[in-house]
Structure formats: structure tokens, C-alpha cells
Amino acid sequence: MEGGGGIPLETLKEESQSRHVLPASFEVNSLQKSNWGFLLTGLVGGTLVAVYAVATPFVTPALRKVCLPFVPATTKQIENVVKMLRCRRGSLVDIGSGDGRIVIAAAKKGFTAVGYELNPWLVWYSRYRAWREGVHGSAKFYISDLWKVTFSQYSNVVIFGVPQMMLQLEKKLERELEDDARVIACRFPFPHWTPDHVTGEGIDTVWAYDASTFRGREKRPCTSMHFQLPIQA
């Protein structure tokens, strides 16, 4: 421009371009923040998935109409169950087997024992524990809803139930079990059956019901007692 008072055109272009160029440090900081954002999102998402995977087996039973919560059996309860198995033989099933204590104890006494449990984490732990105790050949565990299992093949049935389910389970077992079967209830008795044997006190009380009794048929005599107490959980 003439007159010497203007700014050269080239200078104006350079200043305009410089306004749109961000400092290198700013770009690095933005990239780091973006990476941290993706990492944080991944961690939160992974944590939620893990919590869901772990919690679902525990929460699902609570959402059912009749739930069977996991409460580990005490050593005394296991001893009382084994007392009720004296003179008994054949297969045994634990309905809602939890961490496998009853099944493993029965397997150690010579029974072919099976546990049904809805919680897969407890089933996997029970299988590991049976292997560790050396009875994995005679102690089996399955992931299943007890209402979808038929118990007619078992001679001995053990249940740690809750009051809300005992009437319905009573009808199911009376319909499915053979006359020589025995049902052993822990913590809560069945509402209509009269127990043949009772042992223990308080939460350790165990009731034994013979199918021949609650059907009004003659019982088979006991002729032998082939194992001893005490046992350890």
C-alpha cells in the first residue's frame, strides 16, 4: 500500500494462519485425555460386566416365586444328617446343595451322592472341593432348578428348605419317591408329614421322614449300621 501506513498483505496472511495453529503441547494433552477417557470407559464397562456375571446367580433365585438361599450347613447339622442315614443305602440327593458339604460327607460314607444347585459358582466350587477331598468319583454336582428335577431315582433325599417351599416340595416328593425312600429335612420340617425320627436342637434340628410312613405303608426293618460319627465339614 502507498503512504507507508498500511500492513503488508503477506503479514496479514501469516497472522491469520498463526491463529489457527494450536500449540504442540495442547495437542498432546488432548490426545492423552482422550486415551484416558477410553481407558476409564473400558474399566467401568468391564467392572459392570464382571459384577453382573458374579451377582446374577445370587440375585436370580431371589427373583423367583420360591427361593432357596445359600446358608452353609454347620458341622452339627452334617453330623445329624449322617445319623439319619444310618442303616440306609442306595443313592442320595441334596436339593440345593450349596457348597457341597452334605454330598461330600455322604460320599465319604459310601453313598453315591448327587447335589442339585442353581448357583453355578457354588456348583463349580463343590466339584473342586469333592476333587480335593478325593470323592469326585461318587460325588456329583449339577446346575439345575430343583422344580425341574425328578427325584424318583434317589433313595435318600436331603433338603435345607425354607417355610415357603416346604408344602410344594412335600407334594412333589410324595408323588415321585419310591416307598423305601427317606427324606431328611434340615432347619424346617414338612407341614403335613409326621417325622419317623428327630434329632438335634434349634437350627441343628433334623427330621427324617420315611416314604412308607407318609404313604401309610409298612416300613422295612433296619438290620445294619455301617458307619460312625463324628465327621468334619
Curated annotation (Swiss-Prot):
Membrane topology recorded in Swiss-Prot or TrEMBL: Single-pass membrane protein
GO cellular component, one term: mitochondrion
Domain commentary: Contains an atypical, non-cleavable mitochondrial targeting sequence responsible for its localization to mitochondria.
The family this protein is said to belong to: Belongs to the ANT/ATPSC lysine N-methyltransferase family.
Name this protein carries in UniProt: ATP synthase subunit C lysine N-methyltransferase
UniProt-annotated location(s): Mitochondrion membrane
GO biological process: peptidyl-lysine methylation; peptidyl-lysine trimethylation; positive regulation of proton-transporting ATP synthase activity, rotational mechanism; positive regulation of sensory perception of pain; regulation of mitochondrial ATP synthesis coupled proton transport
Entries under InterPro entries matching the protein: FAM173A/B, SAM-dependent_MTases_sf
Gene transcribed to yield this protein: ATPSCKMT
Tissue expression profile of the protein: Ubiquitously expressed.
Main location as per UniProt: mitochondrion
The enzyme's E.C. designation: 2.1.1.-
Annotated source species: Homo sapiens (Human)
